[in-house]
Amino acid sequence: MEQFHLDREEILLLAKASALQLSEELIQEYQTSLSAVITSMKEALAIEIDDADSCESLFMHVVNVEDLREDSVTSDFNREEFLRNVPESLGGLVKVPAVIK
């Protein structure tokens, strides 16, 4: 299968959409690694599966219900103890920086 290649402009568009500032070194690195990921995905999508029923076991969950622990509520620490360890709190809650300006 043909190797897929992202060009520099596509990497810069992705960086802008992700609010990232990339050095020339990172642009080159991302071009190489993302192109390899896309090529691998195209190869995986090209695999033909003749009988979906025979492949069902490949997609089944590995963990059975018996393997899971029972949910139980515990009180490992109290609110005051927790809030003493945070940089800033307000009204008994953890105050975090605003994400949207």
Swiss-Prot record:
The keyword Cytoplasm does not apply. The keyword Transport does not apply. Pfam families: GatC. Heterotrimer of A, B and C subunits. NCBIfam families: gatC. Keywords: ATP-binding, Ligase, Nucleotide-binding, Protein biosynthesis. It catalyses: L-glutamyl-tRNA(Gln) + L-glutamine + ATP + H2O = L-glutaminyl-tRNA(Gln) + L-glutamate + ADP + phosphate + H(+); L-aspartyl-tRNA(Asn) + L-glutamine + ATP + H2O = L-asparaginyl-tRNA(Asn) + L-glutamate + ADP + phosphate + 2 H(+). GO terms for molecular function: asparaginyl-tRNA synthase (glutamine-hydrolyzing) activity; ATP binding; glutaminyl-tRNA synthase (glutamine-hydrolyzing) activity. The lineage of its organism: Bacteria, Pseudomonadati, Chlamydiota, Chlamydiia, Chlamydiales. InterPro entries: Asp/Glu-ADT_sf_sub_c, GatC. GO terms for biological process: regulation of translational fidelity; translation. Belongs to the GatC family. It comes from the Bacteria. Allows the formation of correctly charged Asn-tRNA(Asn) or Gln-tRNA(Gln) through the transamidation of misacylated Asp-tRNA(Asn) or Glu-tRNA(Gln) in organisms which lack either or both of asparaginyl-tRNA or glutaminyl-tRNA synthetases. The reaction takes place in the presence of glutamine and ATP through an activated phospho-Asp-tRNA(Asn) or phospho-Glu-tRNA(Gln). This is Glutamyl-tRNA(Gln) amidotransferase subunit C. It is an enzyme of class 6 (ligase). Coiled coil: none annotated. Its EC number is 6.3.5.-.
